[in-house]
Structure formats: C-alpha cells, structure tokens
From Swiss-Prot:
Native organism: Homo sapiens
Binding-site positions, (S)-warfarin: N87, Y146
UniProt EC number: 1.17.4.4
Catalytic activity: phylloquinone + [protein]-disulfide + H2O = 2,3-epoxyphylloquinone + [protein]-dithiol; phylloquinol + [protein]-disulfide = phylloquinone + [protein]-dithiol
UniProt-recorded name of the protein: Vitamin K epoxide reductase complex subunit 1-like protein 1
Length: 176
C-alpha cells in the first residue's frame, strides 16, 4: 500500500509577515552587534549608539567573554577556535535559517524551526541571567534579541499546530 500523498499546504499570511519582520529585525540587530564588537576590539574607547548611560551599555556586554561562543565555546575549543565566534554570528545564522526554512511548509522544516527556536530561547535565558546577575548591565540590543527569539518560538509553535491540523484534515477519509 502506498503512503498517502499530502497536498500542498500553505501557512497563514500573518505568519509569513511576522516571521519576515522578526527575522529582518534579528538580522539587522545581529549585524549591528557584530559591528559594535569589532569596533570595541579595534578601539576600547569606542562608544556605541546603544551605550546610553552608566547602566545601559551594550558594548560592555557584547565585548565581554560571554559575547563570544556564549562564554562556553572558548574554554572548549580555545579562545581563537573557529567555533568561538561572536554571539552575533550565531544570531545571524539563526535568523537566516529561520527565514529560509520558514518559506517551506514541510514537516522537517517545521521541526527544525521549532527545535532551533527552543534552543535560542534557552540560550537567551542563559545570556539574560549572565547579563543581569554577572555583568550587571542592561544591553538593549541583547534584550531585544531575546524578545525576538521568544516571538519566533511562538510563531513556530503556531506554525507547527496549524500545519499538523492541515495535514490531519488531508488524511481523513472523504465522506460522500
């Protein structure tokens, strides 16, 4: 017996628009965060636009040891290891992945989107803890990316539920 063929299912328009907006914002913030970190490495006195006061300093957080490889990969792979990249590089890859995989309605893509979103929220919670309790800083760029990651988790969960319902309807026997 042949496996059932699923018809093409598309996601709601609001999901595509929301995903595009969140990913575009995430990509732009990741690029800016990368720029801030590079400038801070080049010139330790560099003052970024997001450095608004003594307690609101994104450059301090981005240039800290937790700003590269989540503060973990450097001790595993070495400070100059290829995987010990700025967190903004991982963010850029994540948002591009979310954008590209969001263009397809496949089950595998939906699972990858959901899994990577869960990982990003766990990473965001870890970095938020470091930001508040260890660095004692307020990084507006960091906080906004944490919110974007949480929004993507919600979008991906809604997508998974929507696609699951659509596929179940397709597999139900037709009543004459």
């Amino acid at each position: 017996m042949a496996a059932p063929v699923l018809l093409r299912v598309s996601v709601p328009r609001w999901e595509r628009v929301a995903r595009y907006a969140v990913c575009a914002a995430g990509i732009l913030l990741s690029i800016y965060a990368y720029h801030v970190e590079r400038e801070k490495e080049r010139d330790p006195e560099h003052r970024a636009l997001c450095d608004l006061g003594p307690w609101v300093k994104c450059s301090a957080a981005l240039a800290s040891r937790w700003g590269r490889g989540f503060g973990l990969l450097g001790s595993i792979f070495g400070k100059d290891g290829v995987l010990n990249q700025p967190n903004s590089v991982f963010g850029l890859i994540f948002y591009i992945l979310q954008l590209l995989l969001g263009m397809t309605a496949s089950a595998v893509a939906a699972l990858i989107l959901m899994t990577s979103s869960i990982m990003s929220v766990v990473g965001s919670l870890y970095l938020a803890y470091i930001l508040y309790f260890v660095l004692k800083e307020f990084c507006i760029i960091c906080i906004v990316t944490y919110v974007l990651n949480f929004l993507l988790l919600i979008i991906n969960y809604k997508r998974l539920v929507y696609l699951n319902e659509a596929w179940k309807r397709q597999l139900q026997p037709k009543q004459d």
